[in-house]
Amino acid sequence: MAGPGSWRDKEVTDLGQLPDPTGIFSLDKAIGLGTYGRIFLGIHEKTGSLVAVKVMSARKTPLPEIGRRVRVNKYQKSVGWRYSDEEEDLRTELNLLRKYSFHKNIVTFYGAFFKLNPPGHQHQLWMVMELCAAGSVTDVVRMTRNQSLKEDWIAYICREILQGLAHLHAHQVIHRDIKGQNVLLTHDAEVKIVDFGVSAQVSRTNGRRNSFIGTPYWMAPEVIHCDEDPRCSYDYRSDVWSVGITAIEMAEGAPPLCKLQPLEALCVILREAAPKVKSSGWSRKFQNFMENCMIKNFLFRPTSGNMLLHPFVHDIKNERRVVESLTKHLTGIIQKREKKGIPVAFEGEEAAKEQYITRRFRGPSCTPELLRVPTSSRCRPLRVLHGEPPQPRWLPDQEDPQDQELQQLQKAAGVFMPLHSQDNTSKLFPKQVEVAPYLRGAAQVVMPVLVQVEAPPQVSKAAQMLKSLPTQDNKATSPEVQAPVAEGQQAQHEALETEQPKDLDQVPEEFQGQDRAPEQPRQGQAAEQQQIHNPVPEQPPEEDREPEQAEVQEEAVEPPQAEIEDKEPEVVQVHAQVLLPLLSQNRHVLLPLHLDRQLLIPVGEQNEEVPRAQAWDLEASRAVGAVQALIEGLSRDLLRAPNAFVTKPLGPLQIFLENLSTDGFYTEPEPTQKKKSKVASLRKAIAKRLRPKRFRAKALWRLEDFEFSDVETSRRRRHRRWEDIFNQHEEQLRRVENDREDDSSDNDEVFHSIQAEVQIEPHAANPAGNEVHERSAPMPCNRNRTHRVKFSPSVGEEEPSLEEAQPQQQQQQPMNIRPRNCLNPQNFQAQSDSSSEEDSPVTRRKSQSSPPYSTIDQKLLIDIHVPDGFKVGKISPPVYLTNEWVGYNALSEIFWDDWIMPTRPARPPEEDGDYVELYDADANANGDEEVANGAYEDPRDGANGHDDMNNQLDQANGYEGHGAAGYNGGDVGGNHGAAFNGPRANYPRAGILKNGHNDGRALNRGAFGVFGDNAARAFHGAAGEAGAAFGNHGANRGNGRGNRNREANGRNEENGAFGRDQHVFPEFEHEESDRGTETSDSIALEITSFDGEQNSGRPVSSTTMGFPIGRSSPRGSDFGSDISYNSPILHVYEKDFSSEVYCGSLWGVNLLLGTQSHLYLMDRSGKAEIVKLIKRRPFRQIQVVEQLNLLITISGKKNRLRVYHLSWLRNKILNNDPKSKKRQKAMRKKEEACKAIDKLIGCEHFSVLQHEETTYIAVAVKSSIHLFAWAPKSFDENTAIKVFPTRDLKPLTVDLAVGSEKTLKIFFSSANGYHIIDAESEVMSEVTLPNNNVVILPDCLGLGVMLSLNAEAASEEANEQLLKKILDVWKDIPSSVAFECTKRITGWDQKAIEVRSLQSTILENELKRRSIKKLRFLCARGDKMFFASTLSNDHSRVYLMSLGKLEELHRSYAV
């Protein structure tokens, strides 16, 4: 089954447009009952295969709703319709299944159909899915004796559930309803997650439905808490809690608290301790697993990826037997069901009613507290939080349910806002406040969305401080502009009754054109001044005005009707996205995304002598400094600990803040003292998590590798490039601004975007103008003040100093808010300027130096700047976005790879490669947009045709390949980038820096930790049933900014195959086989279809492919010339072996393969036909020695060392000739066909070395190594010339090599390490390696580390040095490592193959597939390597990988 990127990304917006199932599927019998319909057994008409068909009643056309405008595509709007809530849930579930069902733990989705019935009968929606014959986990538990599953079964099922959740979480989907009923099992014990009706809410733009969702007994406490406190939020870890409850359900037959009523259970879950299993007979690992899953504070709860590393699910002993026993149990259940006539996939009526009731929690009948504010912007897709143009994936009716809910709440006068006093009464201003025009203009420069807030008297006093002041440059004044007077929610309520309703899904301007620079005084000056001088009407704007300015009902406080009639409220017009988050959450100060580019309320010093407002020329720098003064004061007031000490008296701003907090302007259910204690505990917890010592053991810095001068140069270059980009694309950005009406988004998206928490130390602000002095001062190495932040209006825009005494302009560069390691105080002085020179806030989302609890969402942290005269003590990522990463073994790629994507514009820009930063890097998180996985093509220097986002971001932010920080290891939780914290940027070490490459990654390959390499993250998975994809960079392309590897065929960005569907490849890493069997007719790849079929209309996409994948005879049309000659190629042979392939060896051009029961010959010269040579004998290891006309094997049940004559095998192949049959019989009689050597039994491994016409064979037996020497008429081939005892060590693998002194050396590995024996002196020595590593030597079965050395390159010192290099590269020994003639290192572990340059250890290519249980190295010759993969159903397939570039091989090796 193909991965995402083709039909999966096309949203179903109209059910009536779905095809009719007639002639494709037919229904047989009802096998179950679902929430919205019945489940039938379906039959595919052509093939007769069985499927599950979910049949639901639906309307062809939705219900009309006059005046509702909906999105039908991303360019236009029209009067539209809406479906019912049930149909809407079905449609969004359908779309989710289309996108994400390619994972092996997600139920396979075959398609949706709309069945038209005759009049009088309702039409039907058919959702065709994989048939899970065993039913749900709940059904299996109920039909199991004692209603309890075995612990091993629970571990296996929990692991599969976590893998599926990790896949969903990587695509920003929270399932929210994980329970036994929603986890199905197939007949062969495959685990499938179903029911995405609730999880579809996470991909919507409205936040109101993201709060209280799920089934009560499985619901996480933080989800329940959102009902009581809408300011609380939760993230993907709520699913982990549900996994823990499901584990208890499997262990005890029912979830905890199941005897209580649902609402009672909610209260108990929220207030009581986490549940535990009642019986004490479960293992400690299981109990600890459940404890970790059900940590009540979700900030400390591991993610699904972390839980996969838990020993309970990670170290399942005898997994094959566990699966076999579970399969046998499920088979018995299926048979029992068939006898009793119980439905196959039954979902009980109680469960259906329960889900129906639970879904009602989301309806309009829920309390207003549930709907008044979105619980968390983290529960919405990342693309809508940033500057991405509208997406066609948004359903046309998504805004309608929330509009309906709002209207009902408004009619009931029950709209609550975070901005109200604790007694829920609104205090009004006695008179109208005059607001300076530049105050309103500042708020309108970039953000037209304003909130008109009726404020208490304390705010009225504060508003006087915000009145007009003269600018410091003494600009000419303009006529006074009165502040708009509005009645807030009441006025908008009237507008709703009298006017056509506005679309609540309007996307604000800054979300469309976020990539543009803030308005410059010379760009659009006339239009901006016109906005300033035009007073805002008291009533909401007319229809011809921008809808963003009209729809502010979510951000206004509706006072009681009587007070509205009595007096007219006084309004302070503020920026919605800043002030509301600041004032609504008094426990945290939240700075929204892109704050440094949103000009808000300029606050100047109060001047009583200037009664009138001064004209403001929209200079960004002046607005920012004053706004950040307000934010600084708010932050200091709100985050100040109870014992905080302020050395200077409070100024007007501080008094303003004190009044705000003491007047109860913020909603806070707890007393003030309790609030402060919570703040103190919060700060203490964050400080504890950010302690440097927590990272010391995981991230060891090599600061000597940092080249700060290069970073400074790149920063300046990036600054210049940004100016050019913005100037050249001014017209395009203006068009985006004019098209704002074509975009839609909730207004709550405006001010509840992903936010970063800033903790600011209480201190007095420095006078304006001290910015330069502050920046030049060295930063103290103090963990309480490890950050300096700088606010600036734009990226790369020069901001004049706020003090006239300093006329020169101080260039401000964004500084990442990520924590820094204080390893060397002198380094900070050297970094005084460069330490704040991080990338643009558009793309620099990910924090490498994340605390140990960092999550996928941490990349959404913003880059902000410190205003003049302000210090920021400690800045941390939002604590609710944090999550523990367990060492560098964390499955980071699951959460990082697919989250940072550049949004593809309408056409590839012709600007510099850094133009990618204009388009939000996080916008394509779901992979729905037509996006290239590579950066945009740079026609001038061709520097960014990369297949990896890391270099896209590096280029967009001016990073040089040689100026990157040394990334020492794959520590996810560590602190990795003092001044170079890139999003997933994993920069190579010094050796790589010298080569000018920026694609190395030193990390844990064995744990799949992938960070910033430019190859591996591109493709870690396989498409469809048997594909495999590699990431590669091809040729090294140099450019003016430093050498970077680029994809060989990445130049053709205009090609639809290369440009439009590139985003599908990173998601292959989560793709696995959808069925248990991989057959040749089920292979479908984005590159080449393996079964000879066409690609079903999908374009051939190879831009990011380093290893193009094809059949054994790839078609030339599928591969460009660059790929064919410059990129390693992987061939997958279509033959599917029913048993595991253990070994292989090349015989001429053909390949001999040994399996558990047979010896095969694969004819590679023709059509890859398979010939069975020897039957009913297992082969553990084989090697062809053509000089001796022998095939040496370890075979048989007793693992004997046997030799077969190649001539005899050749005669078996040519057995059609009668003469050959006679020769075979004669050879059998003379024992020339096959004979055992020295009667050895229990052989583990052997190695063959040919040296000076002598063939040496070393055989590892139980406690010794036998050395044979075969030469023409010199030695007795049946007797070992030497036997080397290995003391108490059991040899696992053995290898032979000739040392530097032409002495024969035997290398072998054991469970205790790596050992060397001198064949002449018989002295055994050990090679120093980590104690926990088992080293496997060359030409082994691929069970450990293998060294494949040429005869002339094997000396003890060289091997020791080699092993050290391997350890440096991988940080953990992979399954095997080989040096090939192409001067590359190829390492493979259980599920991945890596190819690195031998000289620089740069990762060049990688293969990774989740559907492969093992990757077993077979043999190699020249640039070709053969592997065997063990699939999920224990079948095997053979891969041929061509490593080298042909021109290099021809030149160097005459291949």
Swiss-Prot record:
Phosphoserine: residues carrying this PTM: 847, 850
Region Disordered: start-end pairs: 385-404, 471-568, 760-854, 1029-1080
GO biological process: negative regulation of cell population proliferation; parturition; positive regulation of JNK cascade; regulation of spongiotrophoblast cell proliferation
Coiled-coil regions, chain positions: 716-750
Catalyzed reactions per annotation: L-seryl-[protein] + ATP = O-phospho-L-seryl-[protein] + ADP + H(+); L-threonyl-[protein] + ATP = O-phospho-L-threonyl-[protein] + ADP + H(+)
UniProt name for this protein: Nik-related protein kinase
Domain of life of the native organism: Eukaryota
SMART domains: CNH, S_TKc
Keyword annotations from UniProtKB, A to Z: ATP-binding, Coiled coil, Kinase, Nucleotide-binding, Phosphoprotein, Serine/threonine-protein kinase, Transferase
SUPFAM superfamilies: Protein kinase-like (PK-like) (SSF56112)
Compositional bias ranges of the Low complexity kind: 520-531, 1029-1038
Residue ranges of domain CNH in the record: 1138-1425
Residue ranges, compositional bias (Basic and acidic residues): 494-505, 1044-1078
Record's function text: May phosphorylate cofilin-1 and induce actin polymerization through this process, during the late stages of embryogenesis. Involved in the TNF-alpha-induced signaling pathway.
Organism: Mus musculus
GO molecular function terms listed in the Swiss-Prot or TrEMBL record: ATP binding; protein kinase activity; protein serine kinase activity; protein serine/threonine kinase activity
Taxonomic lineage: Eukaryota, Metazoa, Chordata, Craniata, Vertebrata
Domain annotation Protein kinase: ranges: 25-313
EC assignment: 2.7.11.1
Listed Acidic residues bias regions: 540-568
Biased composition (Polar residues): 471-480
Protein family (similarity comment): Belongs to the protein kinase superfamily. STE Ser/Thr protein kinase family. STE20 subfamily.
Annotated positions binding ATP: 31-39, 54
Active-site residues (renumbered): 177
